[in-house]
Design a protein with these regions (language model features):
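Conserved ABC ATPase "signature" region
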Residues: 98, 109-124
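Helix-to-loop junction immediately C-terminal to a conserved catalytic motif
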Residues: 51
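Catalytic Walker B motif of ABC-type/P-loop ATPase nucleotide-binding domains
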Residues: 153-157
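The feature captures the beta-strand-to-loop junction immediately N-terminal to the Walker
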Residues: 36-38
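H-loop/switch region of ABC-family ATPase nucleotide-binding domains
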Residues: 188-189
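Conserved ABC transporter NBD signature motif
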Residues: 59-74
Length: 213
């Protein structure tokens, strides 16, 4: 099978702290890959390096067979949720996504309605995002990540703030993405989410990535 991401001997330091330690791993196309670990274990740093948000101090990363570099173009065809999504608080979810769609190639008002409904949000809701719950903002961030129909999704702590119904709904959305042949990298501190969804699992601890299954 084809690998969509190749991480090769990646190290990252913040001052004297060694946050990624010689990390190497391949992520196969069309699967849900889980990375489980406590807060501060290095999960988010690895995700940011894969997306090109952070530059590794050594090692290489390939996404869709293209090397990710600090001075190269942002990796294409990726939907990303890393940390709590930021939106304009005085605008509705639909209005926020319309602004983002104006900067993107594929997205339009029909796409916006579809992705909002997909994650369980009402596209006609007028409530400003500043009055959204954390779970609603997470859903909106997920909708944003889906707007350009990416083949690869990088999801970091996607279930934060969701109630039990929201968790079930978003799990089903993620399973549906796999059924469409998309690849998902899911980082979480919650072992239950990882076990429920993932085809492969790695554990991150003190910057060291270990294959669990």
């Amino acid at each position: 099978m084809e690998n969509v991401i190749e991480v090769q001997k990646v190290n990252k330091f913040f001052a004297e702290e060694h946050v990624l330690r010689d990390v190497s791993h391949s992520f196969e196309k069309g699967k849900i890959h889980g990375i489980v670990g406590n807060n501060g274990s290095g999960k988010t740093v690895l995700m940011k390096c894969i997306c090109g948000f952070l530059k590794p101090d050594s090692g290489t990363i390939f996404v869709n067979h293209k090397q990710v570099g600090w001075e190269t173009d942002f990796p294409e065809d990726i939907g990303i949720i890393i940390e709590t999504p930021g939106f304009l608080p005085h605008l509705s979810g639909t209005q926020n996504l319309r602004i983002l769609a104006s900067l993107q190639r594929k997205a339009n008002i029909h796409t916006i309605r579809a992705v909002l409904e997909q994650v369980g949000l009402d596209p006609d809701m007028k409530k400003p995002v500043g009055k959204y719950s954390l779970g609603m903002r997470q859903r909106l961030g997920f909708a944003q990540a889906l707007m350009e129909d990416p083949s690869l999704l990088i999801l970091d702590e996607t279930f934060n703030g969701l109630d039990k119904y929201g968790v079930v709904h978003i799990r089903n959305v993620i399973k549906g993405l796999r059924a469409e042949g998309k690849t998902v990298i899911l980082a979480s501190h919650n072992q239950v989410d990882i076990d429920e969804l993932c085809d492969t699992v790695c554990e991150m601890d003190a910057g060291i990535l270990t294959v669990v299954r």
